[in-house]
């Protein structure tokens, strides 16, 4: 009986971890957008853009627009693949600087595809071209190449690169941190995808439940981050981004995660850990965010929807940066004086919270 129970539980666990939206769910709640995505992934019926395809894609754009886009290699992956960072803009000294990153977790393909779409459109679409004259933009479209090539969250040594921003034990993380530090962005956004089906949700409702949010916003609550950085995120960047999402019928929420403890499920809002990018770059005095798009485990289900969600957010952040550059820069200068004291211990608060699923 125990063995049978274990088999049943294992089957449920495996099904939840690897489940995708049914056709009925995706068509009703997460329909794809009818948009053109000119990235290599859409030249084939399955799979995602491979590293070699991405480099061909970037090389074609660099040949076509030699004065508007370039890239350089910032280091190598553990399997000896060169990691590119793409630069767009006129590189004016006084321009506001924006850095975007995707593919730090290799099984989150919409992050890379959306940034390739953004690079393409910044060069090809008239309504976006003006942004590159007002901003200096750096984009790392595929940060974890080895993981991405096999659609694994982890680097080839099994480590999570988004838990390595303090110890810097992986060569990819060292290269990424150094290149972003050299660029010194005013705004840093790391694009990810999250898993909508979780074991924690199995007992919710009659058939279990899934997360309904197309995207979640993560920005640091670390007490050593200048509070005005958090204020800029909440009051300057997110309102216009939410408006763009509302206009497309996309759902959003601040980032939350769940865990089991004492036979109860607890939800955590936000994050404070300097091991991950959102807090790490905020501690470096950049406006820092991490975008979580609903997508891990969905393969190419609602893929254009996921890509377009990331793309809309990136586009919104660029426009907001142009319109508020002086205010944001002066805020970051003021934040150089913070903190006078360093917090080394904190305690989480527990509170009642209504969550739609």
Segment roles from a protein language model:
Residues 71, 85, 139, 188, ...:
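Conserved beta-strand scaffold positions in the cores of enzyme catalytic domains, especially
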Residues 257-357:
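Hard-cation-handling environments
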């Amino acid at each position: 009986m125990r063995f049978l129970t274990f088999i049943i539980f294992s089957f449920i666990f495996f099904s939840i971890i690897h489940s995708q939206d049914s056709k009925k769910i995706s068509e009703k709640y997460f329909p794809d957008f009818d948009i053109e995505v000119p990235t290599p992934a859409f030249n084939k019926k399955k799979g995602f853009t491979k590293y070699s395809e991405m480099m061909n894609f970037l090389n074609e754009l660099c040949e076509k627009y030699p004065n508007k886009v370039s890239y350089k290699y910032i280091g190598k992956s553990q399997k000896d693949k060169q990691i590119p960072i793409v630069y767009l803009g006129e590189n004016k000294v006084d321009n506001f600087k924006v850095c975007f990153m995707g593919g730090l977790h290799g099984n989150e393909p919409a992050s890379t595809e959306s940034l390739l779409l953004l690079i393409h459109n910044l060069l090809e679409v008239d309504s976006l071209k003006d942004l590159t004259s007002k901003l200096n933009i750096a984009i790392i479209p595929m940060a974890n190449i080895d993981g991405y090539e096999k659609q694994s969250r982890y680097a080839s040594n099994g480590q999570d690169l988004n838990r390595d921003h303090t110890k810097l034990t992986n060569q990819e993380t060292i290269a990424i941190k150094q290149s972003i530090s050299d660029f010194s962005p005013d705004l840093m956004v790391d694009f990810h995808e999250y898993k909508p089906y979780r074991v924690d949700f199995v007992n919710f409702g009659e058939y279990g439940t899934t997360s309904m949010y197309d995207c979640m916003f993560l920005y640091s609550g670390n007490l050593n981050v200048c509070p005005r950085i958090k204020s800029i995120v909440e009051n300057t960047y997110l309102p216009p981004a939410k408006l763009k999402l509302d206009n497309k019928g996309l759902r959003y929420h601040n980032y939350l995660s769940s865990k089991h403890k004492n036979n109860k499920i607890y939800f955590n809002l936000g994050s404070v850990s300097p091991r991950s990018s959102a807090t790490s770059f905020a501690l470096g005095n950049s406006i820092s965010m991490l975008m979580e798009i609903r997508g891990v485990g969905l393969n190419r289900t609602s893929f254009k929807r996921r890509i377009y969600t990331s793309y809309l957010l990136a586009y919104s952040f660029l426009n907001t940066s142009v319109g508020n550059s002086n205010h944001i820069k002066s805020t970051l200068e003021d934040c150089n004086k913070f903190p006078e004291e360093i917090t080394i211990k904190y305690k989480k608060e527990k509170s009642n919270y209504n969550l739609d699923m």
